[in-house]
């Protein structure tokens, strides 16, 4: 067994878990195998490159990484690696207007023993860096002299970004910068945009002298150095000599830098292309503006000494200044702020008070639930020992706010392993009853704060985020960034733009790149230089986004730790670091995640109460109701949370869920880990009695009994260590972590010996048995899914399935209200509701709300006005408010006189049939739209269109369907394929509803609109297509060979004819495609493509 060479491949996992012998010549682990993708950035791994070293001491004090966003062509890690290879004694990271790459820079430097200097190049101009090829305004290069200098710099960066009022336009106050420095910064005169060099270029030596005098007056001579750079420009030598001549006059030092924008010369062409993208020009059109970058790479001390042989003291001074400014980033680690507790309480005592009150509600008095109270005492002791009570109080406060404001929320993930979280009402899963291990969530050996994810109704999450801002203050709370990186399509498009190709070519070539692989499916016609540059820029940062839910709360102004800037969304401020950066530096993060299904469930509850008079309490639903499980076993799960995907619908008939824990297993089975770990088929075979339930050793039975001897959950690995080898729960968590994605050779060696010793002592097991068990544990460690997470989600599976079964109209309307969410488009959701007997009506200005609702005692659905093209939610709300306040609209002129609507908006309402309440056909309403919209009371008489409506024929069924789809995206009472059914029948095309009667292995011809294309990372190149006709849905499997033969058609066609072989031996129906053809629909359809 190897301990440090990564997780096993898919095939190897199946072999291990099934106890099969290894094939000759196959290694235990295949580093290039099909491994799971982690959402977390792994620990930095140095590349092991040979170091050339240097006999001349030198520190690079001016370097831009890719986190200067299109002004640097290497990652911070690549800069550090090259600095280590060259033997530099220190390296400064000085990205534009931020510390975006500081954590990555620090992590790499710590591994490679490179001293770090933190700084930034401030853009003092008033315009954004991306608005023109060469934005006006000077730059100021600031180096922090130690942690205090870092804090002051971070604060000033944040102040400038927030003062700018919008993303990407920092506004600095030069006097405020002067005051903030306080001797804790060192100022370099900068490159060509620096105050002094720019003054020299524009006004000659006298102007340069004045600019330098200003810097010295502001920051003192001991804190200013003249910067000499050489990028190969013809005037570099002359300008450097002039600048060096100013130094004695002002008593300032001289330092040499490379002004690096990339690590090594090979990235020079990419740097120029990125500069052109930043300028929104092609390389040719921006050539006159782009600064020469040929020499803007890191250099060794020897090379710098040769380049500045005429001024060797500049190279020496750079090394000395680097040593003086260098420090480690861990020195700025923050903490959580103290929580405001009632008088007479500490955080620990107040947490205990809240937990015990909640426990009495959840479990009753202590005598009735001794196990639960014992577990709570244990958890409170650990929380106090780790000094985390404040964290739990903050989370409780957030969930309390949600409950007080009627916002559905629930904690998930490993937090559901905690009885304290359950008692506080943070989670909905009882960990005591479900025998979950608390140490999976929190243990004394943990090296960071706990991680609690809170799912919140998507449509209400903004209220919760603003509550956190309000409670803690914008200075102490911010959202976590999400770094948007280049992927295949965006890389091809931007590189083609930089090279001057037309927008049409850019778009066409980018579409040749696969959604799934990021590689070009067909490189024919794409110029080699575009592919080369696109390959280089892939995975480099393009811009900063906002994390889906991460918020940081800090015990000091958060800008002391990391700069904050405005996000694109209103009233959102965002850190310059992502979630992994925050975790690495010790910032405490809370994940407030929007979950569309919680919004849908809330809407469904409200609709049922409003239209049927039934109050639904989700917590009191009968989780054993057979009818719900029977519906799911038929794979009747369109719209149902977590089990509506193609893979889940294929598994449900095989699993045949009968009890709640079956849903827990179903949620966990179709995940990358269990799929790659080979757990799916063994579990289903055992569940259906095909294979026997066997255990490698009797001690494994308690941990694996619930999953029939097949490991699915991470908690099972820990329980196996407890049961087999006598580990404590905390030791078991250490084993899980040591075996996980961040494998530790030393810890693995120690814990392996502990496991063997424990199993020998407890059970007298021979080494060959222990070998097999340990091998399975190690193989499984990377693939297990958290049982606590599956339990949390399984509740939502049941709740949503219950609504679909008992209140299908309310369920459909709720899903439409909560869009965008889920796996299916509104058209598919409406078609499914219709197949379940629900009548769906189009929008109507006198009957619709702004969003979808129910009618006829909750048995029918009415589409909302907000779904009509050009209207939007805000205008739809105004229209409904006017109708509510002043009565129904009596005519089209009455409507347009009371609500201001444009001609396109009235035409869209007419096309959608929303004006039918006025006794007008759609064509008549369209004819009258222009006159009505332009004939408002604020218009002069006679200037509008004619209001006379001639006799017009009505629309055909096909035209009505096309009008519906154009206006709302949904055809409420038809499906595009029904208009082709006669032709399809003549061709021998089988409707979806009849596939259940086809024998396994028979060949059929099917047709339908493509609703999804999906190629999971776990599927080894297989692509799944979902077709839908007016009778139902069909899952289609495309092997890599079939996909390759029909790639362009399969990838782009909105509807397909497919001939293939039926597979239904297991109860789940799939058609394995053999040939494909285009199907032309008279009414449009769109697909959703997933990884």
UniProtKB/Swiss-Prot annotation:
One of its GO terms (biological process) is DNA repair. Its EC number is 2.7.7.7. It is found in: Cytoplasm. The keyword Secreted does not apply. Residues 1-51 are annotated as: Disordered. Its main location: cytoplasm. The keyword Cytoplasm applies. This is Error-prone DNA polymerase. GO terms for molecular function: 3'-5' exonuclease activity; DNA-directed DNA polymerase activity; nucleic acid binding. InterPro entries: DNA_pol3_alpha_NTPase_dom (IPR011708), DNA_pol3_finger (IPR040982), DnaE2 (IPR023073), DnaE2/DnaE/PolC (IPR004805), DNAPol_HHH (IPR029460), NA-bd_OB_tRNA (IPR004365), PHP_dom (IPR004013), Pol/His_phosphatase_N (IPR003141). Belongs to the DNA polymerase type-C family. DnaE2 subfamily. One of its GO terms (cellular component) is cytoplasm.
């Amino acid at each position: 067994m190897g301990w440090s060479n990564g997780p096993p491949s898919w095939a190897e996992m199946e072999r291990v878990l099934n106890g099969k012998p290894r094939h000759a010549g196959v290694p235990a682990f295949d580093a290039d195998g099909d491994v799971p993708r982690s959402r977390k950035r792994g620990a930095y791994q140095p590349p092991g490159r040979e170091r050339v070293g240097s006999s001349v001491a030198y520190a690079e004090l001016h370097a831009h990484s890719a986190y200067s966003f299109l002004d640097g062509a290497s990652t911070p890690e690549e800069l550090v690696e090259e600095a280590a290879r060259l033997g530099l004694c220190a390296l400064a990271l000085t990205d534009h207007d931020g510390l975006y790459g500081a954590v990555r820079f620090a992590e790499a430097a710590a591994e490679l023993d490179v001293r770090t200097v933190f700084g930034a190049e401030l853009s003092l101009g008033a315009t954004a860096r991306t608005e023109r090829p060469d934005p006006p305004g000077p730059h100021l290069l600031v180096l922090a002299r130690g942690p205090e200098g870092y804090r002051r710099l971070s604060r000033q960066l944040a102040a400038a970004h927030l003062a700018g009022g919008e993303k990407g336009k920092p506004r600095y106050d030069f006097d405020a910068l002067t005051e903030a420095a306080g001797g804790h910064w060192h100022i370099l005169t900068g490159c060509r945009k620096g105050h002094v060099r720019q003054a020299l270029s524009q006004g000659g030596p006298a102007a340069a002298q004045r600019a330098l005098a200003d810097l010295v007056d502001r920051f003192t001579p001991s804190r200013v150095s003249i910067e000499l750079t050489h990028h190969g420009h013809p005037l570099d030598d002359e300008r450097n000599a002039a600048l060096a001549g100013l130094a004695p006059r002002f008593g300032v030092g001289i330092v040499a830098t490379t002004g690096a924008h990339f690590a090594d010369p090979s990235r020079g062409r990419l740097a120029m292309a990125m500069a052109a993208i930043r300028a929104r020009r092609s390389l040719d059109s921006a050539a006159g503006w782009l600064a020469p970058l040929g020499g803007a790479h890191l250099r060794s001390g020897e090379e710098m000494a040769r380049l500045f042989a005429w001024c060797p003291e500049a190279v020496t001074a750079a090394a000395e200044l680097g040593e003086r400014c260098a420090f480690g980033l861990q020195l700025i680690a923050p903490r959580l702020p103290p929580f405001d507790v009632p008088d007479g309480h500490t955080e620990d005592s107040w947490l205990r008070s809240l937990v015990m009150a909640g426990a009495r509600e959840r479990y009753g008095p202590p005598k009735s639930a001794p196990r639960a109270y014992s577990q709570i005492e244990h958890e409170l002791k650990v929380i106090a020992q780790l000094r985390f009570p404040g964290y739990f109080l903050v989370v409780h406060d957030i969930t309390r706010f949600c409950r007080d404001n009627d916002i559905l929320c629930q904690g998930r993930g490993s937090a559901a392993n905690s009885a304290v979280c359950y008692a506080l009402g943070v989670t909905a899963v009882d960990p005591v009853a479900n025998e979950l291990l608390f140490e999976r969530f929190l243990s004394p050996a943990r090296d960071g704060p706990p991680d609690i994810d809170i799912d919140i109704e998507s449509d209400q999450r903004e209220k919760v985020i603003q509550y956190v801002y309000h409670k803690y203050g914008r200075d102490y709370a911010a959202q976590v960034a999400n770094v948007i990186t280049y992927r295949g399509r965006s890389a091809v498009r931007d590189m083609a733009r930089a090279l001057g190709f037309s927008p049409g070519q850019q778009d066409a070539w980018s579409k040749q790149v696969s959604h799934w692989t990021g590689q070009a499916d067909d490189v024919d016609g794409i110029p080699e230089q575009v592919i080369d540059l696109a390959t280089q820029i892939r995975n480099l940062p393009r811009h900063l986004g906002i994390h889906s839910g991460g918020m940081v709360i800090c015990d000091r102004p958060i800008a002391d730790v990391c700069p904050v800037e405005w996000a694109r969304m209103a009233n959102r401020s965002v850190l310059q670091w992502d979630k992994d950066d925050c975790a690495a530096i010790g910032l405490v993060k809370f994940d407030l995640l929007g979950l569309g299904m919680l919004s849908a469930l809330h809407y469904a509850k409200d609709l049922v109460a409003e239209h049927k008079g039934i109050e639904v309490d989700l917590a009191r639903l009968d989780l054993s109701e057979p009818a719900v499980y029977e519906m799911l076993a038929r794979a009747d799960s369109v719209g149902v949370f977590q089990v509506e995907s193609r893979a889940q619908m294929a598994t449900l008939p095989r699993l045949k869920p009968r009890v709640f824990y079956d849903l827990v297993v179903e949620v966990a089975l179709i995940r990358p880990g269990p799929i790659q770990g080979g757990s799916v088929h063994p579990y289903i075979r055992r569940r259906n009695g095909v294979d026997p339930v066997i255990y490698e050793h009797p001690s494994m039975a308690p941990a694996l009994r619930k999953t029939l001897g097949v490991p699915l959950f991470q908690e099972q690995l820990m329980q196996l260590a407890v049961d087999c080898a006598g580990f404590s729960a905390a030791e078991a968590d250490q084993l899980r972590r040591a075996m996980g994605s961040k494998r530790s050779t030393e810890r693995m060696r120690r814990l392996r010996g502990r496991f063997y010793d424990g199993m020998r002592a407890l059970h007298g097991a021979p080494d060959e048995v222990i070998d097999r068990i340990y091998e399975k544990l190690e193989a499984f460690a990377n693939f297990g899914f958290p049982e606590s997470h599956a339990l949390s989600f399984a509740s939502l599976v049941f709740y949503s399935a219950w609504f679909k079964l008992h209140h299908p109209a309310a369920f459909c309307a709720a899903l439409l209200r909560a869009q965008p969410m889920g796996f299916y488009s509104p058209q598919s959701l409406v078609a499914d509701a219709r197949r379940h007997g629900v009548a769906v009506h189009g929008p109507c200005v006198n009957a619709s709300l702004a969003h979808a609702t129910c009618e006829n005692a909750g048995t029918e659905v009415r589409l909302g006005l907000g779904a009509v093209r050009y209207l939007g939610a805000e205008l739809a709300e105004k229209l409904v408010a006017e109708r509510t306040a002043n009565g129904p609209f009596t005519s089209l002129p009455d409507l347009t006189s009371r609500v201001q609507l444009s001609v396109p908006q009235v035409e869209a309402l007419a096309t959608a049939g929303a004006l039918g309440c006025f006794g007008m056909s759609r064509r008549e309403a369209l004819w009258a739209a222009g006159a009505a919209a332009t004939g408002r009371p604020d218009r002069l008489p006679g200037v509008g269109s004619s209001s006379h409506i001639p006799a017009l024929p009505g629309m055909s069924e096909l035209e009505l369907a096309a009008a519906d789809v154009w206006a709302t995206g949904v055809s409420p009472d038809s499906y595009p394929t029904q208009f082709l059914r006669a032709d399809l029948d003549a061709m021998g095309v089988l409707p979806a509803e009849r596939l259940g009667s086809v024998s396994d292995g028979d060949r059929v011809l099917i047709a339908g609109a493509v609703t999804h294309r999906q190629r999971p990372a776990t599927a080894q190149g297989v692509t799944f297509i979902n077709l839908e006709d007016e009778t139902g849905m069909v899952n289609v499997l495309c092997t890599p060979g079939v996909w390759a033969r029909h790639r362009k058609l399969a990838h782009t066609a909105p509807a397909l004819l497919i001939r293939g072989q039926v597979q239904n031996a297991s109860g789940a129906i799939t058609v394995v495609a053999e040939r494909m053809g285009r199907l032309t629909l008279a009414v449009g359809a769109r697909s959703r493509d997933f990884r």
